[in-house]
Amino acid sequence: MRVAALISGGKDSCYNMMQCIAEGHQIVALANLRPDENQVESDELDSYMYQTVGHHAIDLYAEAMALPLYRRAIRGRSLETGRVYTQCEGDEVEDLYELLKLVKEKEEIEGVSVGAILSDYQRGRVENVCKRLNLQPLAYLWQRNQEDLLREMIASNIKAIIIKVAALGLDPDKHLGKTLVEMEPYLLELSKKYGVHVCGEGGEYETFTLDCPLFKKKIVVDSSEAVMHSADAFAPVAYLRLSRLHLEEKVSSVPADDETANSIHSS
């Protein structure tokens, strides 16, 4: 099946792409929703649906995979917040509809890779959009044990760093920029102590993938800046702004030919 992958830059969307390929599907394009830069100043958008921290690096992520990237600004807001989503003009879900509609027209996709693990809210809305577009959602991580998933992601050579923290026990000064390998023991400890979701499904943390087996090149962070979003005494919310990055060749990578060269489509 020809598949477009919904990506945030994080570990979950990356690992779900790997599962799609393992099941015999072909990832032909990447799709991403970004903040409308004319309307918001912060990288962290108040969205029920989308991870936006790290959005500045998405173009490089697509270049690392040598796949076409389709992006759309999030112009809507969370208006229809009921358990079951019904089509609502001005809702942020309709931005996803317009984005995937464009990708389907351009790339003739049949399915969509979705990295949802636990959120019925997100999954139901993606399914609503896919049904309207006659696309098959592929969510291989859905309701998997999070400790198992984190272990598998690390074992699968997904190199991801923490770019947002928002939970009791996570310290911006200590944990922003740390890798999954470095954080795994501590995340397991926080899970036992405070019930923190090991994969961050409760919004406790977010990640950005710098390398994985799907990348033709790896992403290197040259400089970054910690930004305090909410200085809560017990669970401060902070994120890492990736200000300068570059791609490096991987020792075992094969250069992409002209047919798979990266192209970017924005709306």
UniProtKB/Swiss-Prot annotation:
Organism: Mus musculus
Name of the protein in question: Diphthine--ammonia ligase
Gene3D superfamilies: HUPs (3.40.50.620), putative n-type atp pyrophosphatase, domain 2 (3.90.1490.10)
Positions bearing Phosphotyrosine: 97
CDD domains linked to this entry: AANH_PF0828-like
Database matches in PANTHER family: DIPHTHINE--AMMONIA LIGASE (PTHR12196:SF2), DOMAIN OF UNKNOWN FUNCTION 71 DUF71 -CONTAINING PROTEIN (PTHR12196)
Family (UniProt): Belongs to the Diphthine--ammonia ligase family.
A molecular function (GO) term: ATP binding
Summary of the function given for this chain in its UniProt record: Amidase that catalyzes the last step of diphthamide biosynthesis using ammonium and ATP. Diphthamide biosynthesis consists in the conversion of an L-histidine residue in the translation elongation factor 2 (EEF2) to diphthamide.
Enzyme Commission no: 6.3.1.14
